Amino acid sequence: MTARVRARELGLPLGRFKPGKHNAITDVAGVLVGHSTIIRGEPGPLTPGVGPVRTGVTAILPNESNIFMDRLAGGAFVLNGAGEVSGLTQVVEWGLLETPILLTNTMSVGAVSDAMARVMVEQYPGIGSEHDVIIPVVGECDDSYLNDISGRHVTEAHVREALANAKSGPVPEGSVGGGTGMITCDFKAGIGTSSRKLPQVFGGYTLGVLVMSNFGKMHNLRVAGLPVGEFLAEKLKHLPRRMNSYGSIIAVVATDAPLLPHQLNRLCKRVALGIGRVGSYAAHGSGEIIVGFSTANVVPRRTRKMVYKMKLLLDQRVDPLYEAVMEATEEAILNSLCAATSMSGVDGHEVPALPLDEVRRFVDATRPIFATVNKTPDEAAVPAGQEPLPDDSLQAEFDWRAKPSDVRSAEGIPFPTRPAAPPADDDADDE
């Protein structure tokens, strides 16, 4: 049996842009991630308030620990709104992020928000008097298939633990933190993350995605574009599955590209395309909610300036980020599946791990096709961020090295030039 590995280690073709050092949202400088995982009680009958408990909290700190005073540009997108991210309307209205982002189960949003508010008031006693009030950003998914969700077992201590555990570097994935009880396409999933480092010709920016993945049905699962779910659904049709809920997904996008709020809103929309790549169709009862931020511009809470200047990546230069965020989202979801192990919980419900051996065999069977169109992710030896243009055809459609004044505004392509007259054909009269 294959050990649990990340999706990239299965040799999957996961896009043309390279990941960052850790292939995680923490590759964006200053972003920290921490978890608090709660697993109590043996699998068995549900006893509300007692267990079994399979839940937790994940904390994303956008610029280490000072997001309240050094706010960042923020944005969001809601594909289907049968879910919740508290504080999201303010992020969209102001275009600013001013609290950490926390992820947990549906019925613990209030407790986590209250705990985060308490922590921030301790750190900044002027909140509510000297400073504005805050609305912590807390996202949720329903983990009730495995967890005693009505018992509301997440406490302030767990929020503090997740914040204290937040660090840079590799991010634990799968059944950890807020993802402890989450399921994707009828397999155990949870937290997953991935990143992309753009080549210097596209700005050299880093972009990372972290998901709490909890959506879908097995037959819809696609891995690197392959209908793996249909294959596995037939082989595993004897296994019980979650039937009363389609689930949801919360995604967090971070980048060091200098994007303004309207651009972050647009970037978040492309995350939804990445979610669709793995098999989501955003069902009636699901919630696909995306929050994004850029670390490139800090908006200080205290300043004597009336006008504050911010850097801006021109809209016609954003396309590579759109492509990269789709790739990173797809890989983050697959990483959540690849990392998670089987779990049992409420009422003895069992959720299997994604069978990596079967996935590998399915992918290997199609490898001759991949070999004709793409390299596997680890074949290129050029360091991330230093690659030439990914392919010659791209330069023909879009000259990234042209000065902004040399391109048509919204289209981002060179102004047309009059073609040179063809050389005279001395033999033309002889035909």
Question: Locations of the language-model features?
Answer:
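Alpha/propeptide regions of enzymes that mature by internal proteolysis
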Residues: 1-387
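Acidic, Ser/Thr-interspersed intrinsically disordered low-complexity regions
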Residues: 424-431
